[in-house]
Amino acid sequence: MHVASALMVEQKGSEAAASSPDVLRAWATQYHMPSESSDAARPALKHAYKPPASDAKGITMALTIIGTWTAVFLHAIFQIRLPTSMDQLHWLPVSEATAQLLGGSSSLLHIAAVFIVLEFLYTGLFITTHDAMHGTIALRHRQLNDLLGNICISLYAWFDYSMLHRKHWEHHNHTGEVGKDPDFHKGNPGLVPWFASFMSSYMSLWQFARLAWWAVVMQMLGAPMANLLVFMAAAPILSAFRLFYFGTYLPHKPEPGPAAGSQVMAWFRAKTSEASDVMSFLTCYHFDLHWEHHRWPFAPWWQLPHCRRLSGRGLVPALA
């Protein structure tokens, strides 16, 4: 009993020590603090946000998203029965006997619900990867942090974590600079061409090879090709557009006009959503609170609403 108490005291003491400014100093040796080159960066707020005193919540959040995605993905791939003809379409769940008469297909309501939940969880996988690239899943355990990031991005679409990490910090170091920011448009800020260039910046033949291998493995385990196309291709593609639209296009979109294609949209010009905390979460795991993300790049996604309150930006009147 005394040994357990001593260990708890020691653990609390180490966490308290780890929550000191030393954590941010260690973070700054591995990552990059934002530029303070403009009053719009509000340098007085630089130290207003303090990172979590423990890595426990960040790790728990990551494991919860991974575990929930895995359960829903396996259900979608192996248990959903997609209709193969118009005769098999039915909106609501039916009895087993009726389902057999309809070819054994799942109801459209069931299919839609699983697709919506899975797409949202795909978004969560990428947001967790994004946190890993910022070291914010586990600020004090870099190897565990990067391992979780690697797992999430592999489950998402087999992207190369190291490549994503490098390019994402190019985005933070050259935010809104045409030709330097891989997330920014290439001279045409239109939604479709920007999304196309954004996606092409991160995709590779090696990634497609791994996706093909993964699809073959799933088929060998009994997954129907139609399920793979819907739940392993369409869902993450829709998720990618959601991430792009709310986390890149809207926050960094230049002001309309003849010079829109050449405007520099430095990080402190990023926009922040006025959505409530709940809607911000449902939209994109708070990725729409983008000024705050660039102001405090060491803040995990689940603390961005707190960061918005610190900044006072984008707050709806009820929260002001």
UniProtKB/Swiss-Prot annotation:
PANTHER family per UniProt: DELTA(5) FATTY ACID DESATURASE C-RELATED, FATTY ACID DESATURASE 2
GO MF assignments: oxidoreductase activity, acting on paired donors, with oxidation of a pair of donors resulting in the reduction of molecular oxygen to two molecules of water
GO biological process: carotenoid biosynthetic process
CDD domains assigned to the protein according to its UniProt record, in alphabetical order: CrtW_beta-carotene-ketolase
Coiled coil residues, start to end: none
Alphabetic keyword roster: Carotenoid biosynthesis, Oxidoreductase
Catalytic activity: all-trans-beta-carotene + 2 AH2 + 2 O2 = echinenone + 2 A + 3 H2O; echinenone + 2 AH2 + 2 O2 = canthaxanthin + 2 A + 3 H2O
Organism this protein belongs to: Haematococcus lacustris
Keyword Oxidoreductase applies: yes
EC number from the UniProt entry: 1.14.99.63
Full protein name: Beta-carotene ketolase
Function recorded in the entry: Converts beta-carotene to canthaxanthin via echinenone.
Transmembrane segments: none
Known pathway: Carotenoid biosynthesis; astaxanthin biosynthesis
GO CC term, one of those recorded: membrane
